[in-house]
């Protein structure tokens, strides 16, 4: 049994660390310490060391929880603390159990991590794509359930990753972005309302590109944040080519019609009414007719209508999760 030091206790790293601690016997290793640059002792029932304390330990490997910063952290540990490269590993090098599958990083993995936001609305309504979801996050790449479903639809239902064209992607998901950028036949532009998150700063209600410019526009879990819904959909309609497609999804409650309340103005009220502080509506079963009113032809792919129960469990997808494909 190998002695492991777990490095990195940020948001995702903290969830990974707790899962590893619970399951270390089954995974055939022993965690002797947790390490982070920040002092996090007050948040844990076990000791958290800083890198300078490593010389006091005897260990077999240091496991870095972050895929994004793995190379940077590895080089720093080697440079600053004299740790050999052979002793630094990633989670996928440590665990061989293959219970689940993540199509984002194309790996079979032993566990998924919980994620989501709690709100009283989730005890009253079943909101697909919202709330706390068990076994939702891949511990290797950090991708979540709705991103895995988006990747599946783009790849298996649309053959999207082999196509040519010009693509605008709002609020790009990291693993989806990586896959699209690898296709050199596509002109790919990412956009976000906040600077530093994408190639361009774009307001979906005032897109700066000319008419009929894009073959594809992707925007997942964006429209529920937009107050002027009509302006957003009119801009999507304006910017898409005649034979283009808009690929999008939103949190949705299939039990009710779309719910909006102008008296809901504070973050606390939005959390209670819609399930998240920055949401301005809760989409419902009338979504298809709303889309048609905006002038789109609307089709959708739903997990439970495409995959078997066994397949969706292996990929940890939400049965009712839905990707919409809009055309003119």
Predicted regions and their residues:
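Hydrophobic, well-ordered beta-alpha structural blocks that scaffold small-molecule cofactor pockets
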Residues: 1-95
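A short helix->loop->beta-strand "cap" motif at the edges of active sites that frequently abuts
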Residues: 81-87, 165, 184-186, 244
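Conserved N-terminal segment of class I S-adenosyl-L-methionine
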Residues: 93-208, 309-327
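S-adenosyl-L-methionine-dependent methyltransferase catalytic module, highlighting the catalytic core
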Residues: 97-100, 107, 227-235, 241, ...
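A generic structural motif
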Residues: 24-31, 184-187, 296-297
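A short SAM/SAH-binding and catalytic strip from SAM-dependent methyltransferases
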Residues: 215-227
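A short acidic, Gly/Pro-enriched loop at the edge of an enzyme's catalytic core
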Residues: 205-217
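Residues that mark the start of a beta-strand
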Residues: 2-3, 164-169, 241
């Amino acid at each position: 049994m190998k002695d492991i030091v777990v490095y990195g206790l940020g948001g995702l790293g903290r969830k990974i660390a707790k899962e590893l601690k619970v399951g270390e016997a089954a995974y055939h290793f022993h965690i002797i310490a947790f390490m982070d640059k920040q002092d996090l002792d007050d948040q844990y029932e076990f000791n958290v060391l800083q890198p300078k304390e490593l010389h006091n330990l005897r260990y077999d490997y240091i496991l870095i929880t972050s895929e994004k910063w793995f190379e940077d952290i590895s080089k720093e540990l080697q440079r600053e603390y004299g740790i050999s490269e052979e002793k630094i590993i990633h989670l996928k090098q440590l665990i061989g159990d293959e219970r689940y599958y993540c199509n984002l990083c194309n790996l079979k993995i032993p566990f998924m991590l919980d994620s989501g936001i709690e709100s009283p609305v989730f005890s009253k309504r079943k909101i697909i794509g919202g709330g706390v979801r068990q076994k939702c996050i891949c511990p290797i790449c950090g991708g979540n359930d709705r991103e895995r479903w988006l990747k599946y639809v783009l790849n298996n239902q649309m053959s999207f990753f082999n196509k040519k064209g010009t693509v605008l992607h709002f609020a790009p998901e990291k693993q989806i972005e990586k896959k699209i950028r690898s296709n050199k036949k596509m002109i790919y532009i990412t956009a976000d309302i906040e600077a530093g998150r994408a190639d361009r700063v774009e307001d979906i209600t005032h897109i700066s590109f000319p008419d009929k410019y894009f073959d594809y526009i992707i925007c997942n879990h964006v429209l529920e944040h937009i107050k002027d819904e009509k302006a957003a959909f009119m801009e999507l309609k304006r910017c898409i080519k005649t034979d283009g497609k808009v690929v999008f999804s939103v949190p949705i409650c299939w039990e009710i019609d779309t719910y909006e309340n102008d008296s809901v103005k504070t973050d606390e009220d939005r959390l209670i009414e819609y399930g998240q502080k920055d949401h301005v509506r809760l989409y419902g079963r009338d979504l298809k007719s709303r889309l048609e009113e905006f002038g789109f032809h609307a089709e959708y792919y739903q997990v439970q209508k495409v995959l078997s129960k066994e397949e969706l469990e292996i990929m940890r997808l939400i049965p009712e999760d839905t990707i919409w494909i809009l055309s003119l």
